[in-house]
Amino acid sequence: MFSANDTYLLQGQTPDEMVQLDGSFRPAWAEFMEYWKKLDTEDTATRFSKGSQYLRDAGVFYRHYSEGVSTERDWPLNHLPVLLEEEEWTTLSDGLVQRASLLELLMKDFYGANRLVQEGKIPAACLAQNPEWLRPLVGLTPRGEDFLYYLAFDLGRDESGRWRVLADRVQAPSGIAFALENRVATTRVFPDIFQKMSIRRLAPFFGKFRKMFQGLNPAADGLMGILTPGPMNEGYFEHTYIARFLGLMLLEGEDLTVQEGQLVAKTVDGLLPLRVVWRRIDGIYADPLELKENSRLGTPGLLGAIRKQEVTVVNALGSGVLESRVWSAFLPELCKVLLHEELKLTNLQSFWWGDPEFQSRFSDEKDDWMISPAFSSNLVFEKDDHSLTGIDHSMVVAQERLSLSTTPAYRHQKLSAAPMTLRMFLVRTPDGWEVMPGGFARIGSSDQADSISLQKGGTVADVWVKTNKPPETYVLSPPSGAVADQLRHSEVLPSRAADNLYWLGRYVERMDGVLRLLRAHHTRLAEFGTVYNPLLHCSESLLQKFGVWETDCFQSQLSFLAGSAMQSASQVKDRFSYDGWMVLRELDKEIKSEIPQILSGDSAASQLSSLLRQCSAFSGLVHENMYRFKGWRFLSLGRSLERILLKLQYLEVLLSQNAPEGAMELAIELGDSQMVLHSRYWGIANSSSVVDLLVDDVKNPRSIRFNFLKLQELLLEIPKIKNSEINAEMDRTLKDCRTILNSRKRSGFNDFPFSDLSNTLRIFSDQLSSAYFH
């Protein structure tokens, strides 16, 4: 399909990762391209489709931002990997290990003795005016004494073929989960050649990554968690992925508090100590008490807990200072001062504008330099949030211009050269820094360097490191012994997660009930047409009671319910399967696309049935696949409570003395009990059979009594609140509900206090929320 002599156009003299200037393949690519030549267009499309489908099924996405609106988009995989020889990779790894050691020493100086400023090695203004240098942390030594545990670096190859470090990702490095998913997806595209070639595996690195976290809490005397900004953050997929992969709690700032100098998580079991926090928020937002006072992402008092060495933060707060572009002008000299070595991997040639010697040169060479804010952390060719307007010239950096190397991208059924950068990851281990033998490459959508941004249509590729050794055999098996106890964080349920699971159960059940009522109404509308019918009037009144009568009303109500369920589910994606999330996501999309097209009658009934099946699929997946931890119990509590409340609403109307003909059949249909009606009552729907099936039957999962007993059972299974009075209040409320429900046997159903039972159940819901969710 392709050879070195085909029309693969290089961009001038810019180095290409696949093809050398003489037209031959680089050694790392030769075997892969021999394989590629044998693939035809149809085979290629089929393979690429498998990789893309895997990513969709796994729920891998990124957030796209446009005009203030963020949307989820499919992960843009460049299906061809980038291949590098192990020898070249080793050179890069050695350089980055040295750089990681240098950055650690800089952190210790910046927040310690500050000798580099005192000795004139760096300008005081570059540190003192840096917004990421957090003064309250000066003099603070982290628990374990190390500041940095996990790093990422962006690299690019310049015109001469040398690799340059474009950015140090220290504050909250992202991308490692995407790198792993890229690997899985790409091996689905090219399973045969991947197995045939000797490609370095990623599993050993992730094993060491896991051990790094375990080593930070060897006594296993507390929890470990990821501190995330929440679902609207562009990296949220990765946060949930890593939480599930490493067995960490997924936490937001409001999930934490500080008690007597100790960081604790608010859980349904009470306050539990947190020993390790992998933060995915910028340091300035971590503690509104001492840092950014209007932050809603952090936890007041966190710095106090760090001072008492009660918690380890990965990476240390304040490490964002190392990402500033200004240090690229000083790192070569600082490496000599601190490590007594030459810097192995250099940045782009950079100068601080405050250097008088450079200012005298600049006017003659200004076309050779890119000018940017000194404290920016973006790649030099990316759009910057910082403006140069009004900035002190001493706070500006000049860097040499760069043309990135290119790599193959498959577009319009042919390979074309596109600019690329490389992201590499490092983790601290007891034996020193370990470099992941892979990573990901960002591929441009055009020949411009800034087109590598995902926001501009860039794509992402897996990176294969070709070796002459047999691939490592390594299984990420679960740890044993005491460490396994540390990883059972899925049993620890944050209060906020319990709240969201409870309401997820309620929203999905309410949506199920509304869809059933709408379907029943439109089925009868198709039967009776425009002729007035008391049963149609009855179903209309029920729809009005649910707020979904007019077409635009039921569209907005269903969209609201689906959106609310999505919002709750997005907060707890680490608590249930990808399949469950994808079904809910598809249901939300289908409601928004199908509901506006719905017409009255049979057409509507058919479309509503399709939506109802999606809703039932989610409930089935959760019921069958979700582990019976506390989270499942709170979700089930919400589901059972909402099912009772819905039954009470429509039975109050359909069992009334003035209910129209056909009301009993409608009640049975809404209760999804037609089959059992036929098997037990010969299909005869009357008040007796309806009450038996939908109120009293302890074996019918749709009946009120079945779900009330379920409520009682679930309440016994969730942790008891330490406040015995609150427990007693909930017990008394359920006892009142039981008394009201049993009163039917004495007084019949005509005088049954539907409203009293509904109101008492809502009181129980409020008590549950107050006890566990605040």
Question: Where do the protein language model's features map onto the residues?
Answer:
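N-terminal low-complexity, Ser/Thr- and acidic-residue-enriched intrinsically disordered segments
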Residues: F2-E87, T91
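ATP-binding N-terminal substructure of ATP-dependent carboxylate-amine bond-forming enzymes
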Residues: F2-P27, Y149, R157-R164, D168-T312, ...
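Alpha-helical transmembrane segments and their helix-helix packing motifs
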Residues: L55-F147, D158-S160, V170-M224, G230-Y241, ...
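Active-site nucleotide/adenylate-binding loops and adjacent lid/helix of ATP-dependent enzymes
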Residues: W89-D109, Q129-L134, Q259, V264-R275, ...
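Catalytic core of tubulin tyrosine ligase-like
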Residues: P142, L334-S477
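Short glycine-rich loop/turn motifs
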Residues: Y150-F153, T421
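Fold-independent oxyanion-binding glycine-rich loops
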Residues: A152-F153, D168-R169, P229-G230, R280-D282, ...
